[in-house]
Structures are given as C-alpha cells and as structure tokens.
Amino acid sequence: MNYTIKSPDSLKASVKLPASKSICNRALILNALSYSPYEILNLSDCDDTEVMVKALNSNDRDFDIKAAGTAMRFLTAFLSKVVGEWTITGTERMKNRPIKILVDALNALGARVEYMEKEGYPPLRIFGSALQGGEISLAGGVSSQYISALLMIAPLMENGLTLHLEGVVISKPYINLTLQLMEQYGVKAEWNGQTIKVRPQDYHPIPFTVESDWSAASYWYSMMALSKNAEIELLGLFKNSLQGDAAGAKLFAQLGVGTTYTDRGVVLKHNGNRTKKLNYNFVNEPDLAQTFVVTCVLLNIPFRFTGLQSLKIKETDRIEALKTELRKLGYLLTDSNNSILEWNGERCEPQAHPVITTYEDHRMAMAFAPAALVLPEGIEIADPQVVSKSYPHYWRDLRTAGFIIIDNEQ
C-alpha cells in the first residue's frame, strides 16, 4: 500500500498527540515492579506500547515483541528477575539488532540469559531468579535503553547496582527520564560524574498519567516550518516536560517556528527567524534527527548534524535510509564516522515519480510526509501503516488538518 499526500489549501489543526512512548514503556515496567493497583492514564495505543501491555498482562512464558526494540530490552531485564523460564523473540529485523551488551551485564549481575539462535542477538531464553546485583561498567556510548533497563530493576537486586559509565554518555535525557520516573515511584538513585548508584529499596505504586509525545510533535513543527500559512495547536505538551525531545522546540525556533505555551499545550507560529546553516549534536535527541534532516533540505538550509551513532541500529540504518530517499528528491547528503550527516546544498536530478521507502521505520514515514507542503505533486510514501508503531492516528490527524491523502491501491 502507498499513500500520496498532497498539501492542504490552508493548514489548520488542533491535534491531540499520542502519549509519550518513552514514558509509557518505563511507566509500565515501574507499575509492574511496584505491584501497582492503579491503571496508567493516557496510555498510548501505539504498537510498541500495546506489545508491552500484552506481555505484562499475559500468563504466557513465550513472548513475541515483534519490532518493539524498547520492549525487547526492558522486558529482557524485567523477566530476568521474575522467577520462571521465559523466551522472548521478535521480527527478523529484531533478530538482527544486537543485545549482547545488555545480556552480558545481566549475567554479570546474577541473571541467566541464553541465546537461542545467533550469539549476541534475540531470540533469548531467560531463567528468571532473584538477582545479586553489584558493580559493573558499561560504555557510555551504548543505547540508553540498556542503561534504563538495568536501572529500573536495580533497586530490587540484593546488593543494588553501581553502574560506571565509561567515556561520553549518549542520550542522557533518556537516562534522566528513567531516573525521574523511578523517583516518582519512590526510588532514589545517585548520579555523580560517571557513576550511577541505586541501593536496594522498594517501589511504591502511584496514580500516573502520561504526557503527550514531543517526538510526535516534531512532525507538526516541521509542517509549520515548511508552510507559508498555518495555524497549529498541539495539546498535552508541557514546558517543563520530562522528555528530552522537548528540546526540539528551541531548535525549531532556528527554522522559523515559535512556540507559545498555554494551559492546553502549545501554539505554533512563524517567528520570522531562519538560520542560514544549522549545526547540531543530536546525541541527546536521536529521534528528532530524521525530522530535522528532511526539514532542512526542503528549506534549502545546509546542515551538519553529529551524534547520530545510534541511528545505525534503530528500526533501520537511518543514516543510509535518509541518504537514499533524499537522493530520490534531488538532494545529495554525505556521512562520516557512522555518526555525522551533512548537506552542503549539493543537488542532483530528482526522480520523476519518487516513492519514499520507509524500511519498516515509522519515523521515515512521518518525517517525509510534511514534504507534501513544498513538492508540487505531493509526496508518495510506501507502507504508510508503519506509523502504528508510535503514532497510529497520524494520517487521520493529517486529513483532519486539511491534507489530501490518496490510497493508491483503492
């Protein structure tokens, strides 16, 4: 299935964004660890969260988390401390996403996790038991989800956890998010320099409501940046958000988008400012990178983006995917060191009728959709259903905002 998205005559939207996937997935684990009687409010209905809900509410011993990378990491750690024998698997892509660093760390802390097929990759067999805990070291450059997975079960280890992070720590806001949510559930950690300590202690159940997703908001910021005339209100966003991706508001200010906070959320307006070149390190906000890459080239703003190392191991190799798909639209990007992507304004002949491949990656589909605002023929996107991973109502919300969306198979 392909969608062709065409620009509205005028873009007007008041959007109820999906709940933050990052907060949902952490809150679900913490709710389970605290044996909470409370139902989490405003829980996302995206694929990743539904996979986690199903697993945590299941009496099964075998779990298929499909393409949900966060669920794979968080549940692997969670199940390692739940007495019993468990298996966890996923899609073929998931079976090629490395998990050795987390498995080694868990086993060093007293867990017993084994590989069922290829060394270092899912599927896994987990023999859950009480964990001794102790002291381990991890490279700071590993996925923050490995670190978060360990931290959330740390207070329930016999000796707690002392975690030394070596080198540059990437995605710090996601680690901070985990620690802030743990504190809301009654567990305090100490983060001094490169070391995080969590002593043995109990979680306490609390009523919890999830805030809206700043990552999802970024696509609407892109639409505002690319539009000549638009009125956009995004509901459920807070200025003092727990989410690191809230930094996108300040960054989009350099692309001409102003943010006004209200008691309902935020209102977007053109601010009259637009940088001539954008340099930024996305090490703390990797999920915003695709949105800014696509927005910048369509605004004809050269850029140099660093800190993109985690993009190589996401749903797809996002660096290669961006280069390939933007070449179809006539833009030549270069990358280096597996972590830098830049565009100096170089163009090439665009394809006559480009179709954007999404690589089973929800963020590819959502980042490219705003291109409809500047491309005369609109933009055609393959496998648009991939958005269900994090923002199931994305296309419905675009239609409500005035976009014309044509299902090319009907």
Q: For each predicted feature, which ranges?
A:
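Short, structured segments at the rim of ligand-binding sites
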Residues: 1-410
